[in-house]
Amino acid sequence: HIGVDKDSGLIHSVETTSANVHDITRAAQLLHGEEEVVYGDAGYQGIEKRAEMAGKSTTFRVAMRPGKRRVLPDTPDGRLLDLVETAKAHIRAKVEHPFRVIKQQFGFQKTRLRGIAKNHCKVNVLAALTNLYLARAYLLATG
């Protein structure tokens, strides 16, 4: 699970869990506390109701479930809701780009069973390298 800055596309937090842990259970650890708006896929439905999110002034914009989106009516309101979901998806795509770099540029396709601590270290190093890779143009321009 990673937290990505919406403007820069850089990874700001990493949580490594086993595959059977749901995304929403680690959402609080991905937030650094200064977020105004958080975008999530449909797996984060109901995040604002969770106890660990109580008292936060963050606005959550979570995707509609695919089944609900598929049956939106072909009316002006339905088309507007579909456009809103498309806009949310464009912003959420920023989170997927670092995964592409980790998988394609650094070849981290599958995780071997080494223990959660070793895998956590490897993912953290890959996240740092991904940030350097994504910020390379800015870093080279600044000298």
Positions of the model-derived regions?
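Helix-centered, glycine/charged polyanion-binding patches within enzymatic domains
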Residues: 32, 36-37, 42-117, 121
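Intrinsically disordered, low-complexity and often Lys/Arg-enriched segments
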Residues: 140-143
